[in-house]
Curated annotation (Swiss-Prot):
Zn(2+) 2 binds at residues 822, 896, 903, 906. It is an enzyme of class 2 (transferase). SMART domains: RPOLA_N. The gene is rpoC. This is DNA-directed RNA polymerase subunit beta'. The keyword Acyltransferase does not apply. DNA-dependent RNA polymerase catalyzes the transcription of DNA into RNA using the four ribonucleoside triphosphates as substrates.
Length: 1206
């Protein structure tokens, strides 16, 4: 028996008739399924127990042998073997066909493999196979050509002339004879000769034929096996028949399709035995062919066979295809045991690493563990007794349950799982009720809210799984977002508002200027109601024992507020005292200006000092995020998660105390709003007058009106924000970053402004009312356009974004960190990414966390800042940019030489941990999720750049899809294919512009549409591949003109442009990994003396291997050019057929793989999931498969790590 979990590759091929018979346990001769009275399977039928095995465990059909003791006996009465009924899932049967039948995949697929091999058109093949024409197999003396077609009349004519001297056949038999006669070696030789001379259409056909012939020759498949003599029947449990309540039966469609085949086959046998007339036999053979076609792929040819209610029957091919097919439904994702699902509720008192599990759910999930413990503690006598105790929910069960779940992490998952933070591990605590309690800080990562969201719980069972969950997936470990390395667990809403309120200062607060000895005094005074949170006070600096305070500062009084003293309690001791929301205070020291020498104070003391000082800004959401990032950088993850918990508690506590609410009175309408509106109304009238006089065009008028009203809204917004009290609840909410922004407030109290029509064009009639005043009917109607479009957009966007993520994951799933250093000698030159003058991504962000490829010296001091292959940390990156260096070479995934993945050095640091990336990290999947997850935040709209002349710029999600699918973009830019000077720009016919570029050896002219904006002028010198007009470049063309490196950088820049414009930050390395996957194939131009086929797509590594061999043997190498594939195409072109088949176009991929006899080396993640092995990433990598752990004598503390013994 082969070990199911330990094989190295999987191979697929065509099955010979002998092979099919060897799989089979007997021939199915009757179309019957089960007897309607006894409900037992019919003998020799589709469910026959003699062929497929018994329906009941250890019991033969007639009941003579029952029980395990007769294991392996074959009953002498009914012929059924006594064994487990499970064999009915694996035993196959077969049908001996009375006439050969063609397999529809090989005859009908595009391109038709059978047609290419025989050099016949698919049309001709169809005529022969479906008995419309004869094919000449052996022409004899007739002068006919071999493989030519004859109609019935022509065949009669020749048959009368040359009786018995030539052979022409109909149906699959004729094709089978032709296939058997093919000599692959001779075909190969003649085709290789033809390649030398042929051109155009003949050349492409020859290349296609050569590919098929080569496939058959290399794989050892016999071409005649594309014609079936024997049909396999899949095991009955996979096409079950079940009884419904009303005594009727529900059956799998396959049984109907098999039944048709058997009926027709039996009828054909009988007709042949009777020696029926040829025309009747022919008709029956054709019907048999059609029945087999329907079984294999119903609906591929002609009308599909339908069942009751005109529903097409699901054939074998449909069982594999699509979301409901075998691959995606059962192999890539399975339902698992030990899982539960419930609504989530907030758990504000939980620690970062905890979640609350409902008691009933926990009991059911941990049932086996509890049962074992009950028996071990002798609370229950045996397992059965333990089970009944649990079902009765006896009191002693709960104590045991608490011990069982202690330190046994569970996984919580929220659908849709867009990135790896959608599944995290927590330690469960038991809670009453039926809702799962979730820690408020992890909601951002899950994108969860508590309006009825549900989450699933999974229990990791094995010790290894528990260890992985605890070490890698615990929520307290996942503080950084893998897409940009920024903290993802920032406080939000109430927590932000609470901390904002806590750090506010007020001028009129009670007892301002009181000086306290230490923190405890402050807290007591606050508890006793002597001071308010917002009271500005002084505290002796020495009492803080803060290591960042200087000697001089320690002897002074620190001017701060009660709230800030409380806030600073939660921050690690060695941190500076945070007194103002500034980066300097955060990174280094508390500014000197807050330390006051008590001797210098005048008569009014500290109170008088405070009255002169401006109030300090409170801490908003962004600043809280910066604090978290800083603490994370300087301290351990544990410290950070502890501080986060404290920050959360403070936030909730003080937002409750603040009692901030919104009332209608908080929305104050601007008194002089009408004046602003009247003023702008006059401007609009003036523009209309100019238009009526013909001074400006319709476009100019429209743009001017839109601009006037936008300005009006901006002016109202500005004045509103000015007139707002700092303590206005709405202002506090928006200023702190808890909820809302200035624009929302303007709509409530100012004016709603301009709205967009369904087409996306802005309606020039503004909504001058605010929600506080109420809208008129017309205004309300206009504003519904936008609102409804928003909802429709969101729904569409979610589906689109999910599909994009799926394609990205599929193309990059086999990119894993495979080695430490690939030793490449190339690097990527990086600098600022700019669009015109606008900064898209600064240089410093591009180099941080990457490895250098060159030595960088300070231009003035000549001091070495960094050497090659060293990690550029945040400090070094700052040094490099401070030295005025604007570009450098770094290690990049683009230039990595590692096969099937990247190396540690070319990837850089792991953004999710901030540490060096480890071998085994599945960086491809992380990259795909990082790009796909923010997809839902991108817009769907196409921006219209004013008027008729403006071209549409595709942005947001459609643009990302356009880039990754390598499609021709909308609004395409014209690029120059030569280096030279722009000689002339003139008008050509059809209002087009002609740009003439003069190079050293040739002059080329390019046509651009009359409305496109030019980016060059006469006399300007241009590089090869430079853009002449505005717009997006077509990447495939650009690759041919500008080369590989320029194309990679261009695609990277374009992706970053879209995301950064929407305010989404994604690290370059993720885009690099994806773009590299799109460029991993080359197209062979000339094969030289290698075995490669001209015109074929091969992996870049296979190409270099073949050439290396050729060089060794002093032969001519092959030449090739790089090819840019869209992600869908790249996924289908992957080396692994299992991965490609489970993605899209399942039948095409499998047909191709079977003919080529492909082997899948199971290198990616998907292939291993499909066959049920551990994925070759992380601890599942082959290099870690035989690691053993020693058991420590003494308990291991958290800081030590268990020693690993090879």
């Amino acid at each position: 028996m082969i070990d199911v979990n330990n094989f190295h590759y999987m191979k697929i091929g065509l099955a010979s008739p002998e092979k099919i018979r060897s799989w089979s346990y007997g021939e199915v001769k009757k179309p019957e399924t089960i007897n309607y009275r006894t409900l037992k399977p019919e003998k020799d039928g589709l469910f026959c127990e003699r062929i497929f095995g018994p329906t009941k465990d250890w019991e033969c059909s007639c009941g003579k042998y029952k029980r395990v003791r007769y294991k392996g006996m074959v009953c002498d009465r009914c012929g059924v073997e006594v064994t487990k009924s499970k064999v009915r899932r694996e035993r196959m049967g077969h049908i001996e066909l009375a006439a050969p039948v063609s397999h529809i995949w090989y005859f009908k697929g595009i391109p038709s493999r059978m047609g290419l091999l025989l050099d016949m058109s698919p049309r001709a093949l169809e005529e022969v196979i479906y008995f419309a024409s004869y094919v000449v197999v052996d022409p004899g003396p007739t002068g006919l050509e071999k493989k030519s077609l004859l109609s019935e009349a022509e065949f009669r004519e020749y048959y009368d002339k040359y009786p018995g001297q030539f052979v022409a056949k109909m149906g699959a038999e004729g094709i089978k004879d032709l296939l058997e006669e093919i000599n692959l070696d001779e075909e190969l030789k003649s085709l290789r000769d033809e390649l030398e001379s042929a051109t155009g259409q003949r050349l492409t056909r020859a290349i296609k034929r050569l590919e098929v012939v080569e496939s058959f020759r290399n794989s050892g498949n016999n071409p005649a096996w594309m014609i079936l003599d024997v049909l396999p029947i899949i095991p009955p449990e996979i096409r079950p028949m079940v009884q419904l309540d009303g005594g009727r039966f529900a059956t799998s469609d396959l049984n109907d399709l098999y039944r048709r085949v058997i009926n027709r086959n039996n009828r054909l046998k009988r007709l042949l035995d009777l020696g029926a007339p040829g025309i009747i036999v022919q008709n029956e053979k054709r019907m048999l062919q059609e029945a087999v076609d329907a079984l294999i792929d119903n609906g591929r040819r002609g009308r599909p066979v339908t069942g009751p209610g005109n529903r097409p029957l699901k054939s074998l091919s449909h069982m594999l295809k699509g979301k409901q097919g075998r691959f995606r439904q059962n192999l890539l994702g399975k339902r698992v045991d030990y899982s539960g699902r419930s609504v989530i509720a907030v758990g504000p008192s939980l620690k970062m690493y905890q979640c609350g599990l409902p008691k009933e759910m926990a009991l059911e999930l941990f049932k086996p563990f509890v049962m074992k413990e009950l028996v071990q503690r002798e609370i229950a006598t045996n397992i059965k007794n333990a089970k009944s105790k649990i079902e009765r929910m006896d009191d002693e069960v709960w104590d045991v349950l608490e011990d069982v779940i202690r330190e046994h992490p569970v996984l919580l998952n929220r659908a849709p799982t867009l990135h790896r933070l959608g599944i995290q591990a927590f330690e469960p605590t038991l809670v009453e009720g039926r809702a799962i309690r979730l820690h408020p800080l992890v909601t951002t990562a899950y994108n969860a809210d508590f309006d009825g969201d549900q989450m699933a719980v999974h229990v990791p069972l094995s010790k290894e799984a528990q260890a992985e969950a605890r070490m890698l997936m615990l929520a307290a470990q996942n503080i950084l977002n893998p897409k940009d390395g920024k903290p993802v667990v920032t406080p939000s809403q109430d927590m932000v508002l609470g901390n904002y309120y806590l750090t506010l200062e007020r001028k009129d607060a009670m007892n301002t200027g009181t000086i306290f000895n230490d923190t405890n005094e402050v807290l007591k005074a606050y508890a006793n109601g002597y001071v308010h949170l917002h009271t500005r006070i002084g505290v002796h600096a020495k009492s803080f024992n803060n290591p960042t305070f200087t000697e001089a500062q320690n002897n002074k009084i620190l001017a701060t507020s009660v709230g800030k003293v409380i806030f600073n309690e939660i921050i690690p001791d060695s941190f500076a005292f945070i007194n103002e929301p500034s980066q300097t205070n955060l990174e280094g020291k508390t500014p000197d200006k807050y330390f006051i020498d008590s001797t210098q104070l005048g008569e009014g003391g500290l109170k008088a000092y405070f009255e002169e000082q401006e109030l300090i800004e409170p801490f908003n959401k962004k600043f809280l995020g910066n604090i978290i990032a800083e603490v994370f950088n300087r301290f351990s993850i544990t410290d950070t998660s502890m501080m986060l918990d404290r920050m959360k508690d403070l936030g909730f506590k003080f937002s409750s105390k603040a009692g901030i609410t919104v009332g209608v009175a908080d929305i104050v309408v601007l008194p002089d709003k009408q004046d602003i509106l009247d003023e702008h109304e006059k401007l609009v009238e003036r523009v209309s007058k100019q238009f009526n006089r013909g001074l400006i065009t319709e476009d100019e008028r429209y743009n001017a009106v839109v601009e006037i009203w936008t300005d009006a809204k901006d002016q109202i917004q500005g004045e509103l924000m000015q007139s707002l009290e700092k303590t206005n609840p709405i202002f506090m909410m928006s200023d702190s970053g808890a909820r809302g922004n200035a624009s929302n407030f303007t709509q409530l109290a100012g004016m709603r402004g301009l709205m967009a029509a369904p087409s996306g064009k802005i309606i020039e009639l503004p909504i001058t009312s605010s929600f506080r005043e109420g809208l008129t009917v017309l205004e309300y109607f206009i504003s519904t356009h936008g609102a409804r479009k928003g909802l429709a957009d969101t729904a569409l966007k979610t589906a689109d974004s999910g599909y994009l993520t799926r394609r990205l994951v599929d193309v990059a799933q086999d990119v894993i960190v495979r080695e430490e250093d690939c030793g490449t000698d190339r690097g990527l030159l990086v600098s600022d990414i700019k669009e015109g003058t606008e900064m898209i991504e600064p240089f410093i962000e591009r180099i941080e966390g990457r490895y250098s490829k060159e030595t960088i010296r300070h231009p003035e001091t000549d001091e070495i800042i960094i050497r090659p292959d060293e990690l550029i940390t945040a400090e070094i990156a700052k040094k490099i940019t401070d030295a005025g260096i604007e570009q450098m070479y770094i290690r990049s995934a683009f230039t990595c030489n590692t096969r099937h993945g990247v190396c540690e050095k070319c990837y850089g640091k792991n953004l999710a941990t901030g540490e060096k990336v480890e071998v085994g990290e599945a960086v491809g999947t992380i990259a795909a999720q990082s790009i796909g997850e923010p997809g839902t935040q991108l817009t769907m709209r196409t921006f219209h750049t004013g008027g008729v002349a403006g071209s549409d710029i595709t942005q947001g999600l459609p643009r990302i899809q356009e880039i990754f699918e390598a499609r021709n973009p909308k609004g395409q830019a014209v690029i120059t294919e030569i280096e030279g000077v722009v000689e002339d720009i003139k008008l050509a016919k059809d209002r087009q512009q002609e740009i003439v570029v003069k190079g050293a050896n040739e002059t080329r002219s390019y046509l651009a549409s009359g409305t496109s904006r030019l980016k060059v002028e006469v006399g300007q010198s241009v590089e090869r591949g430079e853009v002449l007009t505005e717009g997006s470049i077509e990447p495939k063309n650009f690759l041919a003109v500008a080369g590989l490196n320029a194309t990679e950088s261009y695609l990277l820049k374009e992706v970053q442009k879209v995301y950064r414009m929407q305010g989404v930050e994604i690290d370059d390395k993720h885009v690099e990994v994806m773009v590299r996957q799109m460029l991993r194939k080359v197209r062979i131009i000339e094969a030289g003396d290698t075995k490669l086929l001209p015109g074929s797509l091969v992996d870049i590594h296979s190409f270099t291997d073949a050439n290396r061999e050729a060089f060794k043997e002093r032969k001519r190498p092959a030449t090739a050019k790089p090819v840019l594939l869209g992600i869908t195409k790249a996924s289908l072109e992957t080396e692994s057929f299992l991965s490609a088949a489970s993605f899209q176009e399942t039948t095409r991929v499998l047909t191709d793989a079977a003919i080529k006899g492909k082997r899948d080396d199971l290198l990616g993640l998907k292939e291993n999931v499909i066959i049920g092995k551990l994925i070759p990433a992380g601890t599942g990598m082959r290099r870690y498969s035989d690691v053993k752990y020693d058991k420590a004598e003494t308990p291991v503390t958290e800081t030590e790590e268990a020693e690993i013994i090879e």
